[in-house]
Amino acid sequence: MADKNSNEKLLYCSFCGKSQHEVQRLIAGPQVFICNECVELCNDIIREELEKGTGGEVIGGASADHPLPTPQEIRADLDQYIIGQDFAKKTLSVAVYNHYKRLYNKGGKDDVELAKSNILLIGPTGSGKTLLAQSLARLLDVPFVIADATTLTEAGYVGEDVEHIIQKLLQKCDYDVDKAQRGIVYIDEIDKISRKSENPSITRDVSGEGVQQALLKLIEGTVASVPPQGGRKHPNQEFIQVDTTNILFICGGAFDGLDKIIRQRSEKGGIGFGAEVSSKDDGKSLTKLFQEVEPQDIIRFGLIPELIGRLPVVATLEELDEEALVSILTQPKNALIKQYQKLFSLETVELEVRPSALRVIAKQALARKTGARGLRSILERALLDTMYELPSMQDVEKVVVDEKVIEKGDKPLFIYREGGGVAQSA
């Protein structure tokens, strides 16, 4: 090999001193050179600084140019999409802000380590639990995935094991591990995996308490082994390692029957003159009862104490009344009526839904006990024939929906462009 004293003019890295024959690539600058090994070393140094939060790391969609939104800003954004639920929105805003602030300050010089605060959402069906989680993920621009707790089983049994949740999260961000490790996971129907009784069962409960046990480490923070590109696990396979420590887990459920447990606890009184007297039927609504929930109530319902301990932030959602459902139909940024009006506008037709019709839709949703989730099915059924016939019709300018269309299934009012003609049917 030639050296510095030979006739051959060798080029050397200005940083490490290696010759062009000792490295794969030498990059030239103005009177200086750098080898590929030094470039890789520089990249490693910069990457380590970013992970410590000293170099403007992007966390949760925030950066030096786009700082993490404050709790009030998070709440204001949620207000655009979700009606009511003030307590839940405030609780979530603070919890999410603190979670991503914790990631910003990770690797600080002091010894204080900030623990993760996962969230438990308790509220009736159709009250907005899933929408809250989706809206948060959209605002923060982080990967988001919804997992159904009822499909989960213990590892080794038929069904999806808990690590499949992380696999879905990876798929959402094209297997970018760093991005996935800052994501949000919403586990729906968490109440459906409650154990069958308060006492430990002799028989194995693979889809109830077994799943709760499997979720413990995942929620608290562990390194999950995920098959690459969505494949199944098999021996001699390389796995993708995902650290769940910084993933925010939000669990939600309707918890049907929890109100009875809370009422039983609150009605228990002492004996004698000093006992607190309480009425057996104090007329408390589901909303007020849920606001009084204690960890012991959720444990009695069937979630294990260890899981409750890993979900320290509890946010309860209110029952939606008629006024709230009417507002949901019209006020949010992506309100249901606005969606259908947009759909009709693609046919150059204006859609008008009269206030009386909105009231009937809200009343029917209340009667079905489906909350906001039932609004779309009611409106879809009422407009099905119209949406079927409208693309084939000529010169329709406006479609008007009143209460009879919703209640009795009557045809909407059609207003035509030419001559201002009016037709009652298609």
Curated annotation (Swiss-Prot):
Protein name: ATP-dependent Clp protease ATP-binding subunit ClpX
Binding site for ATP: 124-131
Keywords: ATP-binding, Chaperone, Metal-binding, Nucleotide-binding, Zinc
PROSITE patterns cross-referenced by the UniProt entry: CLPX_ZB (PS51902)
Gene Ontology CC entries for this record: HslUV protease complex
Family: Belongs to the ClpX chaperone family.
Disulfide bonds: none
Gene: clpX
Entry annotated with the keyword Nucleotide-binding: yes
